Design a protein with these regions (language model features):
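Short linear regulatory motifs enriched in tryptophan with gly/pro/ser
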Residues: 1-186
């Protein structure tokens, strides 16, 4: 079995008043038999959250193109990860949101994925070992669809072995923000 160390970066969230001077991250050690739902729980605890909400993991290729969504078990329907876009919508999105220096190959992959999205995955049924770290460009995680606490996840290390229990935080940087802003301070 493989043990993975993932670095989980928390993106700024200006609508909730979270704009830190320094980057906030947690390094989490997890073995390949753990599910994405268990990885979610580890991230949830690492960032000192207390009110449970829906979440989503998205795999991305080396160009940052979303490949597939893995969702909270109660949201899982096994349908497409997102709704299909028609050619006009895809062209408009590429023109407005895709970087000018994106390769034609990346744009074509985006076009194919958006016109025929893959089925979403169930986070409770998908293990870490199901991902190939050599081909996984990036993984993103959004907690609380609505307040949109967005995270970028990158693989730091792998080693042979297994954990005897739950995933663990092995390093951290920066203070975790409050899950909800204090309205009296705004």
């Amino acid at each position: 079995m493989t043990i993975y160390v993932f670095r989980v970066w928390l993106h700024p969230n200006p609508p909730l008043g979270f704009e830190p001077d320094d980057k906030v991250r947690r390094d989490i050690e997890i073995d390949g038999s753990h599910t994405l739902a268990e990885f979610h729980e580890a991230i949830f605890e690492a960032f000192e959250r207390w009110d449970s909400h829906a979440y989503e993991f998205i795999t991305r290729d080396e160009d940052g193109i979303a490949l597939r969504s893995y969702v909270h078990p109660q949201l899982y329907e096994a349908g497409p990860s997102w709704r299909p876009m028609d050619d006009e919508e895809i062209d408009r999105f590429i023109e407005q949101a895709v970087p000018d220096d994106a390769s034609d190959d990346a744009k074509e992959r985006f076009r194919e994925l958006q016109s025929n999205p893959p089925p979403e995955g169930n986070a409770a049924e998908t293990t870490i070992d199901e991902f190939d770290p050599d081909t996984l460009g990036a993984l993103s995680y959004t907690f609380d669809i609505g307040d949109n606490w967005e995270h970028y996840i990158e693989l730091q290390d792998t080693q042979e072995g297994s954990l005897d229990g739950d995933p663990v935080v092995v390093d951290e940087q920066g203070a975790a923000p409050s899950q909800y802003p204090d309205l009296d301070e705004q």
